[in-house]
């Protein structure tokens, strides 16, 4: 089956004695080789514990019409869903802990336990997370871009040994849209405030996919901010952008209009390629608070 976007392979069985350490990979392509054929992105070898965090989704909820540059904000809420997998063949119990911190202040933290059978996957959900006087994230020109540090830890319930942990910076914001009944056009709101979208187009940082560093991303995304733009449309014919791109957009207050691959030319023989690509893309960056619109190319 064709694979687009990220690719992860479990290698525990294959790298165990006496199996071969060679991995033949065949790329079937019915058209000429293009710039993203083959391995171009980073490759990782991950050593896991008895269990691991597969992915997670943090969803802030900011009600009402908020005012930027205000020191006292009404409380916000959030939900967090964490996918956990037991990698052992036996039943085990695990503790899932998360903390949400702004600078040195802990905004929220909770712990819950889960018991999984051997090889089982399940999701842990934290609902109604209260965030007092939240520091709200705003698009460029409309306000500031404060970020919270979200940390998730997975430990063995018996030994309390750390099995896995993940962290990322997240923004507290609410994005919505509707159709203007007078003009028939779509209008966007951030934290209840209507936003005039001023956007640019992003084909890619480098056609040869070299030097995809945070510094370079910040340089070019920063140019968009200096021009007063607050949105970038990521062209669907490019690559699945690296995390550094979204980090730069976080920093400069740039919303992202994310297009999907293979939506303009669907001649493949496989089933429902657009739906599969949509799922893979959203799993890659499920917590990017600046992603405000998905679309086909």
Tell me the role of every PLM-derived stretch:
Residues 281-297:
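Active-site groove signature of glycoside hydrolases
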Residues 179-186, 242-244, 273-286:
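Alpha-helical scaffolding within the catalytic cores
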Residues 221-275:
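Aromatic-lined substrate-binding rim segments of carbohydrate-active enzymes
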Residues 157-160, 251-256, 284-289:
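Secondary-structure transition/capping motifs at alpha-helix termini
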Residues 196-199, 231-234, 255-258, 292-296:
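Structural recognition of the beta-strand scaffold that forms the well-ordered cores
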Residues 1-232, 240, 251:
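Secreted/periplasmic carbohydrate-active enzymes, especially glycoside hydrolases
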């Amino acid at each position: 089956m064709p694979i687009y976007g990220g690719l992860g392979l479990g290698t525990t069985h294959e790298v165990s004695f006496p199996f071969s350490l060679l991995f033949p990979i065949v790329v079937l392509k019915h058209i000429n080789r293009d710039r993203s054929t083959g391995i171009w992105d980073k490759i990782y070898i991950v050593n896991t514990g008895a269990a691991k965090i597969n992915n997670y989704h943090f969803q802030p909820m900011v009600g009402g019409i908020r005012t930027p540059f205000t020191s006292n904000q009404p409380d916000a809420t959030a939900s967090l869903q964490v996918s956990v997998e037991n990698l052992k063949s036996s039943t085990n119990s695990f503790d899932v802990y998360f903390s949400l911190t702004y600078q040195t202040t802990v905004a929220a933290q909770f712990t819950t336990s889960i018991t999984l059978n051997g090889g089982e996957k399940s999701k842990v959900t934290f609902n109604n997370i209260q965030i007092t006087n939240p520091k709200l994230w705003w698009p460029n020109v409309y306000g500031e871009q404060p970020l919270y540090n979200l940390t998730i830890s997975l430990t063995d319930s018996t030994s309390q040994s750390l099995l896995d942990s993940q962290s990322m910076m997240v923004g507290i914001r609410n994005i919505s849209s509707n159709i203007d009944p007078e003009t028939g056009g779509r209008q966007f709101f951030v934290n209840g405030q209507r936003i005039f979208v001023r956007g640019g187009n992003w084909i890619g940082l480098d056609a040869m996919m070299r030097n995809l560093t945070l510094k370079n991303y910040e340089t070019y995304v920063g140019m968009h901010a200096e021009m007063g733009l607050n949105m970038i449309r990521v062209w669907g014919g490019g690559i699945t952008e690296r995390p550094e791109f979204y980090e730069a957009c976080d920093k400069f207050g740039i919303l992202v209009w994310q297009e999907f691959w293979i939506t303009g030319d669907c001649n493949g023989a496989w089933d429902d390629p657009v739906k599969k690509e949509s799922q893979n893309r959203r799993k890659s960056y499920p917590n990017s608070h600046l992603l405000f619109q998905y679309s086909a190319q």
